[in-house]
Amino acid sequence: MKQPSKLIAGLVAVCAAVWIIAAIHPLDRQAWVLENILLVVFAGGLALTYRRLQFSNTSSVSLAAFVILHTIGAHYTYEKMPLGIWARDFFHLSRNHYDRFAHGAFGFLLVFPIRELLLRFSGIRRGAWSFALPVAIVLAVSGCFEIIESIVAEIVAPGKGVQWLGGQGDEWDAQNDMVSALVGSLLMMGVVAMLKCTEARPHLHPLPLSPAGRDARASGSEGRGVGLGEASAERNKFPHSNARDIGKHFLPIAVACYVAFWIALAIHPLDRSDWLLENLLIFISVIVLAFSYRKFRFSNLSYALIVVFLAFHTIGAHYTYAKVPAGFWMQDWLHLNRNHYDRVIHFSFGFLLLYPMRELLVRSVHAGKQWGTWLAVAALAALSSFFEIIEAVVAQIVRPDLGAAYLGTQGDIWDAQKDMGAAFAGAVTSALAIVLLKRASAEAVG
């Protein structure tokens, strides 16, 4: 059995010592326990997977640094961390920003180990996607952490909401935390890109591609063709996606139907300004799909799923999400406390777009099919988190006087967390469906 290096042993000893000292008389024992639950799970996971993962020295130092920062924050509670209070007074800030610093450190310090794991195990290759996917995973995890925080807050201190979490009066606390993690991860990936770590500093990735990574790359390399001719052959490898079965004119017909539907709902929307803002997503999506069509063509099934989601979103934009008739019908029939059409759309975002995202990652990024499925979940969770950030920015620009109320939260202080949770649940449901269908198909063939 390979023994841990002196560096690893030293890092473990330092982290353990800091944790033990911080565990003595924390400022708030209940908050300390809650803050340390995820830390203990995280440390346990690293310990159990050490022999398999064996991070590089750079990644190990990054992980240890984050553990120490979080341990100190948990001891004082993030809201009352002395260093943050000093910075608040010295720079004349509106609040203690140690929590923002910790979220930024989360992105900055953990994105490198995540990238290392992806390069070694997932089959993806060095390049733009090897930088984008780790950032997406960081943002997805940050969003999931905000979801978990909201659940814990409602269980431990129902009714106190973000005040119990140390939001310090910031109604955009969750979005600002996610921005901090995103900026931190982008900074680290920018540093890695500038230093060209993959070529100029090979010692940062001392281990060769793992057997699992070679298998993943082999399974993902089936989808290398991205040109029109190669894409046609590749689409045959995805179930129910052969254009000849559905009709070679499927895409033009689907586009024509959607355009007609969009034009009909563009006439006299309930709120024209809200309609314009909601349609920015549609405009951006259509432009991206149009310009990338010749380089990467999705299967007909993927295009169908994309069109269905855009149609659902178009309905929400016409009525504004808080006033969609179907949502009122669900509210009355199921005796709900609000119009939940927005939750349906967020769930649909994850459920319907999981397959297209998986197809993109497997065929274009060369991720293994299993890795592609779960990386697609992370990518969609990241997009959902990013959308909540964009919404917050737009609300503060367009109607700063209304704040979160402008977004149609309908009085729900956890609206952002529930939207992200719905998208994540939809993506996981779709991923499980794909895994089960593939397993059933394999058993039937066998």
Regions found by a protein language model. Name each.
Residues 28-32, 80-84, 98, 142-143, ...:
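Interfacial helix-loop-helix junctions of multi-pass membrane proteins
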Residues 41-50, 105-121, 155-157, 179-195, ...:
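Membrane-interfacial alpha-helical segments at the cytosolic side of multi-pass membrane proteins
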Residues 61-70, 133-147, 304-313, 376-390:
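Hydrophobic alpha-helical membrane-insertion segments
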Residues 122-139, 365-381:
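Internal alpha-helical transmembrane segments of multi-pass membrane proteins
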Residues 202-244:
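Intrinsic disorder/low-complexity segments
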